[in-house]
């Protein structure tokens, strides 16, 4: 299905329909079918999002990205979580990053997005530009505004933001090195004082 879409034989909407009907009609179930279905649906949704030129740099924009990636996958797609979380990370030997607390998530997103919006890249060398963007994206990820799907949402948001700044970026590196991307975000936000 993916190959047929890449070669232009079918649209992304047709891919989404084929994925949905495949899992609805499948009679023999395997233990990991739920994970496979999530991955297939999310991949098709991400491809659709990245195929669009639109981008809104705001809290509404990032929550919309989450909703569109996970619609039909998570009941809470596009909703900012209302509970606190911690996650034992193997890369931190079971320790957790300190994520944003539930009552402050929206304000934290607004603050981080505004700080970035006010930053001027004029005259900044490319190495410092990249370092600044990495810090910005890392900070957004640390807020972890959603119950699930924060890393994938951050990746799509990052691609669309970089494109809005004039960078030519696609999803290949993020999809091929997703585990590295997540672990880099974890390490960038870990403090063990």
Summary of predicted features, one role per range:
Residues 1-193:
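FIC/Doc superfamily catalytic core
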């Amino acid at each position: 299905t993916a190959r047929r879409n890449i070669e232009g034989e079918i649209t992304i909407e047709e891919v989404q329909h084929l994925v949905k009907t495949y899992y609805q009609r499948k009679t023999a179930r395997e233990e990991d079918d739920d994970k496979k279905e999530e991955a297939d649906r999310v991949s098709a949704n991400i491809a659709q999002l990245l195929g669009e030129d639109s981008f809104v740099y705001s809290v509404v924009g990032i929550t919309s990205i989450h909703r569109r990636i996970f619609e039909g996958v998570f009941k809470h797609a596009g909703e900012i979580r209302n509970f606190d979380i911690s996650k034992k990370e193997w890369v931190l030997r079971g320790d957790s990053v300190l994520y944003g607390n539930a009552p402050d998530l929206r304000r934290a997103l607004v603050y981080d997005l505004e700080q970035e919006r006010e930053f001027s890249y004029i005259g900044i060398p490319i190495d410092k530009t990249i370092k600044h963007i990495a810090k910005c994206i890392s900070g957004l990820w640390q807020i972890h505004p959603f119950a699930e799907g924060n890393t994938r949402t951050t990746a799509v948001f990052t691609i669309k933001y970089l494109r809005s700044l004039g960078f030519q970026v696609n999803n290949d590196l993020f999809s091929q090195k997703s585990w590295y991307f997540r672990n880099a975000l974890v390490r960038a936000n870990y403090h063990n004082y």
